[in-house]
């Protein structure tokens, strides 16, 4: 008789399923989100446990020397131009997930899973998604070995991090970095436009993580104060935004309320040619910037994504008294942070990024390790304390447009 050497905590899995059901009930009561996220996810606790267990073991596999990353979507079998529907169903198993996942390493490609009349799970096809796709199904995103995001109704609910299971809560992370992004200007409407800065910064962090070489990004406000923290001369200095010459600006969004947000998406703006083109160009820009962080040294850019230099070496500012104390937190439910020291942040890349963020209070530093761990560094204006957000890859909005809707909705409700 075979026994699993590892089982995910059943109470955790049951709690995730209960939260999915609670979200479905909330959507039914809330007409705004019911209209956007109309999909009705029906998966039993046992099916969910089997799905997560199989995805977990597949995430540990190496295929021809490469680590496998893939995503699963639980949805009914259907025929569509963007879906390759298999003639014959294949029982859900880790081996086939590894085979298919090795060819679909993209945040816009999914392996489709359904349940038969007897409740058994099967692989039934492959789905290709556009950047404007609303992720309303149950979606499992494998970020690396043992690192799994659980997303439903367009919102990240929970995650597995190696041998830990957590509920994801990015609110503390967002509250820490958005004041720096929204710092210039006080007009509420303009601040909403600055939300664009926020999610493009997360896309760049995704791109940094994807190249798997490790990298450092320094995001700085206007002016040249940051130069005191950089060793001169800088090997690759200049300035550009890395946008296409024929860049099409995204339409201005006069979003006064959550209802305006609903109307914007319901009227099909996401599918308009100019919107799609502009969004694609911005994502290409983010990928180009993220890729350059693979060059040894740091990339410095403005909050509007104008690149000042890359391959830069960080130094301690002469006027800085230095710091040894930090507060470390993760985007997890109930994590309010803990006291730590510089020495436990990681290697030289993390230490230098932390020092830069401490010396430049209006800046944000981002580090992606070769293993795919992402950390954000920023100095809190209220206390002067250096805040480090570790495991930030859990909050990089891999859910795409759906995540933007959720977070923008919450932002509009606060203003």
Tell where the protein language model's regions lie, with residue ranges.
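Divalent-cation
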Residues: 1-415
